[in-house]
Amino acid sequence: MNSNVENLPPHIIRLVYKEVTTLTADPPDGIKVFPNEEDLTDLQVTIEGPEGTPYAGGLFRMKLLLGKDFPASPPKGYFLTKIFHPNVGANGEICVNVLKRDWTAELGIRHVLLTIKCLLIHPNPESALNEEAGRLLLENYEEYAARARLLTEIHGGAGGPSGRAEAGRALASGTEASSTDPGAPGGPGGAEGPMAKKHAGERDKKLAAKKKTDKKRALRRL
């Protein structure tokens, strides 16, 4: 089994162990950390889909990999649960600034996990790894939300507490989670959440501007 533990200086290993122990005992809201006893540089994590988003009700498995240059270099983040999101690539790679140019050694693992959870609330289509998801987010939010919600139901265990419990058991056993109840979660995760309202407002503004322009053109022709 490949591991970067042997490549890290002893004082870095102690710092990582301390933070991981703290995160395990006192994790951020909606996040759980499952340390890999065989490899401290491979952190297994679950993130609950935030309310008011198409990911609500889902439980998403991910991992953080700490490289040999950590913390001088940022960790790499991957979703293990399939997800339809502009900033998540086909292989699960997560694209967020804190894992790239905004990284500093002082940020720590907790900050990274909180930033990734925030990415589920506020996707960034301008740095999309999934171009289709990024395009739909900007042009057709309802379709984007429907696609994201469908994958959440199928892969994210979005069947209420029973589905989330199964996803948690799958993480502990190292197997892929599956939904026990693929029924639509509806509610705030649907097309009426804050993300939908934000994009609906942007579309309304664009539509109003277009109508105004068309009206001016029509008047010029008179």
UniProtKB/Swiss-Prot annotation:
Annotated positions of the N-acetylmethionine modification: M1
Domain UBC core: 11-157
Catalytic activity: S-ubiquitinyl-[E1 ubiquitin-activating enzyme]-L-cysteine + [E2 ubiquitin-conjugating enzyme]-L-cysteine = [E1 ubiquitin-activating enzyme]-L-cysteine + S-ubiquitinyl-[E2 ubiquitin-conjugating enzyme]-L-cysteine
NAD recorded as keyword: no
MF-aspect GO terms: anaphase-promoting complex binding; ATP binding; ubiquitin conjugating enzyme activity; ubiquitin-protein transferase activity
Pathway the protein contributes to: Protein modification; protein ubiquitination
GO cellular component: anaphase-promoting complex; cytosol; nucleoplasm; nucleus
InterPro entries referenced in this protein's UniProt entry, alphabetically: Ub_conjugating_enzyme (IPR050113), UBQ-conjugat_E2_core (IPR000608), UBQ-conjugating_AS (IPR023313), UBQ-conjugating_enzyme/RWD (IPR016135)
Compositionally biased residues, Basic residues: 208-222
Residue segments, region Disordered: 156-222
Alphabetized UniProt keyword annotations: Acetylation, ATP-binding, Cell cycle, Cell division, Nucleotide-binding, Phosphoprotein, Transferase, Ubl conjugation, Ubl conjugation pathway
Assigned EC number: 2.3.2.23
Quaternary structure (record): Component of the APC/C complex, composed of at least 14 distinct subunits that assemble into a complex of at least 19 chains with a combined molecular mass of around 1.2 MDa. Within this complex, directly interacts with ANAPC2 and ANAPC4. Interacts with CDC20, FZR1/CDH1 and VHL.
Role according to the record: Accepts ubiquitin from the E1 complex and catalyzes its covalent attachment to other proteins. Catalyzes 'Lys-11'-linked polyubiquitination. Acts as an essential factor of the anaphase promoting complex/cyclosome (APC/C), a cell cycle-regulated ubiquitin ligase that controls progression through mitosis. Acts by specifically elongating 'Lys-11'-linked polyubiquitin chains initiated by the E2 enzyme UBE2C/UBCH10 on APC/C substrates, enhancing the degradation of APC/C substrates by the proteasome and promoting mitotic exit.
UniProt protein name: Ubiquitin-conjugating enzyme E2 S
Organism (species): Homo sapiens
